[in-house]
Amino acid sequence: MIVNTFQIDKSNGERLDIYLVEKLHPISRSKIKTYIKGSSILVNGDKVKPGYILQKGDFVKVKIKDNIQNNIPILPEKMKIDVLYEDDYVIAVNKPSGLVVHPGVKNNAGTLVNGLVYHFDRLSDINGDLSRGIVHRLDADTSGIILAAKTNEAHLWLSKQFKERTVKKTYVSITWGKWEEKNGVIKGWISRRKSDPTTFTFSNISENGKYSKTNYSVDKQYQNFAKVLFYPVTGRTHQIRVHSSFIGNPIFGDEKYGGGVKKGKEYKPELYKYFSNQLGKFGRHALHAFSIEFELFKSGGKRIKLDAPIPEDFVDLEESLLGHES
């Protein structure tokens, strides 16, 4: 059984069913529509249509018995977990690229949650069994720090910090091209692409989507690429990937947002061949969650800053690209 209530803090023209795709992941949009039509999901206590446009102040109540959650057993799996920090309430893990965070319809094994269940006796279950312990997410191909909570109380404490934007995060990335400014801010509104709900679009119009903001600093600028540090202020899905793509400097290897093989075609044939080889060799997008700073639970206000070492494949990629330009 999934029981939850969401309050809409801003009206941005988003449909109810699309809004819940992210909130109720991995339940499909078609399944969510069925629940809405069957009155298992209400807005302000009333039955509405899946296409209902959410308004500021709306209360969305979800009370569903989800077969996906019930039919996927969360089996403990022995796997190497790189623990960066642990206390009685919080766990910080250095997630490798390629590791999916939690089970879903297509992958009920080999996820970070399966590993956490094996290694830790206590994990929060506030977001259901499929997301045991998980406070926030990283894309499968993104490596780096991710937080998990051992208790529901600690989970709510951490979630509150994310919502209030007091958690400070730094991401390291390799991007295409030359940046116009060494330091800057990318801000605007992000929304799901209607033709493909797994991807997002960016707009400067406030009515289109959720507000997003990312600060950035170009650490090293090379001829055809750059090493960039991103400091997300908000935490929208795919935010850094969407932002870097929007300004014309997509993340190296990011096929979804213009940083893949097609980007290499903009260069001379010999460079295109070289970049294609590097893209195939690297096999993912070059984005790493490098550091996180937050307030520890029941610590009297003590903050902690954690770093996750840059992965070896990331270091090799930068050295290879740099070597080709020298």
Regions found by a protein language model. Give the residues of each.
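Short coil-to-beta-strand transition motifs
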Residues: 73-78, 204-214, 286-287
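Short histidine-centered loop motifs in beta-beta connectors
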Residues: 45-47, 223, 228-231
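Short beta-strand segments enriched for Tyr within beta-sheet-rich domains
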Residues: 158, 236-244
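RNA pseudouridine synthases
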Residues: 1-194, 301, 310-322
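Short, conserved beta-turn/loop elements at beta-strand boundaries and strand-helix junctions
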Residues: 180-181, 195, 220-224, 297
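Pseudouridine synthases involved in rRNA/tRNA modification
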Residues: 1-31, 79-81, 220, 233, ...
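Short Pro/Gly-enriched beta-strand edge/turn motifs at strand-loop
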Residues: 64-66, 196-199, 211, 271-277
